[in-house]
Amino acid sequence: MIKQRTLKQSIKVTGVGLHSGNKVTLKLRPAPINTGIVYCRTDLTPPVYFPADATAVRDTMLCTALVNDQGVRISTVEHLNSALAGLGLDNVIIEVDAPEVPIMDGSASPFVYLLLDAGIEEQDAAKKFIRVKQKIRVEDGDKWAEISPYNGFRLNFTIDFNHPAISKNLSNYTLEFSAQKFVQQISRARTFAFMKDIEYLQSQGLALGGSLDNAIVLDNYRVLNEDGLRFKDELVRHKMLDAIGDLFMAGYNILGDFKAYKSGHGLNNKLLRALLANQEAWEFVTFEDKEKVPQGYAIPSQVLI
């Protein structure tokens, strides 16, 4: 049986909030069977909980933000959510003492190492997957995203930026998902931004924590980071990282074939909502027989590195 997973112990880290520029303490806690992924703001009294849920995503302008019915929000959850998805974790409580998750280095890698440092523990209950049964597609102008039936989790993402530093032959990436491939090929890809956009955002009191330490920054001609890129195609890999985190807002790992062109947080969430709203398009599955598990989900996370 493929079992649910949580953390062996609690662990915490301190970082900077992307939008506030303020210090944020993040604590990750183990959680009982069937708890799911739950975000919590401990700076409020009483603390406010945000279970991972596609319908809780109500703002995708600059990041993925969860907003409850009272308008309370927690922002920038996508990179941590991607790390949780990548390692196949099912039950974790995430506490932050601020309105946003710390940005760290702009990738999912610091969260991966934090989770692995806490340790991953199997629980005595079957892990549930969402298996796609029918193709679902959403569009926004020339942008689109779709997911189709597939015995595993495969992703194909294409970006299209008219910029000298982003060549066309580095604008597409395909991944046959496994925890190991996620860690090695996707988790280190950092978020990116254009200098003109950062200057505008900071003039509006946003992205105050944004810097060359936590993002790839481009001017009109080149990448400004002294150390350059971690991968030649780091930008499209990061968009795939975002998509993995956005799709995991369902709270379950997905079995399906995801394809996207110029998609972002909003369209990814629209696709997930459209899938979940169509009862004929998906089903929950568990795997009692390990031999029948799709290959990408068969490798225990404990042996990743």
UniProtKB/Swiss-Prot annotation:
UniProt-annotated catalytic positions: H265
Cofactor(s) for this UniProt protein: Zn(2+)
Annotated pathway: Glycolipid biosynthesis; lipid IV(A) biosynthesis; lipid IV(A) from (3R)-3-hydroxytetradecanoyl-[acyl-carrier-protein] and UDP-N-acetyl-alpha-D-glucosamine: step 2/6
Amino acids binding Zn(2+): H79, H238, D242
Domain of life: Bacteria
Top-level EC class: hydrolase
Listed EC numbers: 3.5.1.108
GO molecular function: metal ion binding; UDP-3-O-acyl-N-acetylglucosamine deacetylase activity
BP term (GO), one: lipid A biosynthetic process
Reactions mediated catalytically: a UDP-3-O-[(3R)-3-hydroxyacyl]-N-acetyl-alpha-D-glucosamine + H2O = a UDP-3-O-[(3R)-3-hydroxyacyl]-alpha-D-glucosamine + acetate
A Pfam family reported for this protein in Swiss-Prot or TrEMBL: LpxC
SUPFAM superfamilies attached to this UniProt entry: Ribosomal protein S5 domain 2-like
Any one GO cellular component localisation term in the record: membrane
Gene3D superfamilies the UniProt entry points to: lpxc deacetylase, domain 1, lpxc deacetylase, domain 2
Record's keyword terms, sorted: Hydrolase, Lipid A biosynthesis, Lipid biosynthesis, Lipid metabolism, Metal-binding, Zinc
Family per similarity comment: Belongs to the LpxC family.
PANTHER family named in the record: UDP-3-O-ACYL-N-ACETYLGLUCOSAMINE DEACETYLASE 1, MITOCHONDRIAL-RELATED
Function description: Catalyzes the hydrolysis of UDP-3-O-myristoyl-N-acetylglucosamine to form UDP-3-O-myristoylglucosamine and acetate, the committed step in lipid A biosynthesis.
Protein's name according to its UniProt entry: UDP-3-O-acyl-N-acetylglucosamine deacetylase
